């Protein structure tokens, strides 16, 4: 499961790394991104724009938006089998930019860890998105992060990890690509290129959205 992450880089680095237009009036650095919040995504329909969608997928056919609270992650192994995800996987994919994600080790203290790339560059997690219309006609755009089995670093902390795409695979993920090739991208990121360290339990509360939580405990 991936239930929290950070995306706290400046506008210029976002433009340089992801090649997107950033609306400065909307974007701000986020140190503790949490489900149900509007968060940055780059979609296959608008690959040159940084949009803000609600975290927690609401399928277009859902009766109400509450289902989104249970759909923050989609398992790579079953993504083509689940009605909630398979249409979005085929037609509505996105990048979820981040600079780290957080996971809680399954020990007696439930120690939170920050996981990032060793070179400390921002990365993109593989996501899917959808749009849902309420009875009054209001449209909610939402997304889910795809997870896979853990690599050797992550398995010491948790049983799942988000799919982190290679930079060279990001256009393939957003492009008109067949399902077999897409599924081939949904694999664990190499452990030797990642690092993890324990952080403060301040991260447990999404209201603590400040740089302090990224520090080593």
Label every PLM stretch briefly.
Residues 1-217:
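Short linear sequence motif anchored by a di-proline
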């Amino acid at each position: 499961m991936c239930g929290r992450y950070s995306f706290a880089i400046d506008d210029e680095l976002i433009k340089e790394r992801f090649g997107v237009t950033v609306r400065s009036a909307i974007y701000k650095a986020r140190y503790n991104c949490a489900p149900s919040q509007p968060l940055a995504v780059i979609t296959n329909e608008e690959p040159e724009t940084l949009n803000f969608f609600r975290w927690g997928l609401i399928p277009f056919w859902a009766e109400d938006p509450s289902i989104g609270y249970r759909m923050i992650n989609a398992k790579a192994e079953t993504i083509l089998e689940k009605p909630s995800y398979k249409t979005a996987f085929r037609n509505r994919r996105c990048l979820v930019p981040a600079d780290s994600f957080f996971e809680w080790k399954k020990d007696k203290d439930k120690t939170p860890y920050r996981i990032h790339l060793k070179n400390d560059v921002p990365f993109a997690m593989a996501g899917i998105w959808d749009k849902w219309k309420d009875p009054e006609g209001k449209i909610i755009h939402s997304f889910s992060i795809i997870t896979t089995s853990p690599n050797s670093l992550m398995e010491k902390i948790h049983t799942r990890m988000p799919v982190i795409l290679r930079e060279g695979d990001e256009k393939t993920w957003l492009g008109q690509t067949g399902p077999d090739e897409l599924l081939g991208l949904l694999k664990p990121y190499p452990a030797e290129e990642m690092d993890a360290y324990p952080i403060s339990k301040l991260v447990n509360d999404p209201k603590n959205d400040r740089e302090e939580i990224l520090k080593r405990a």
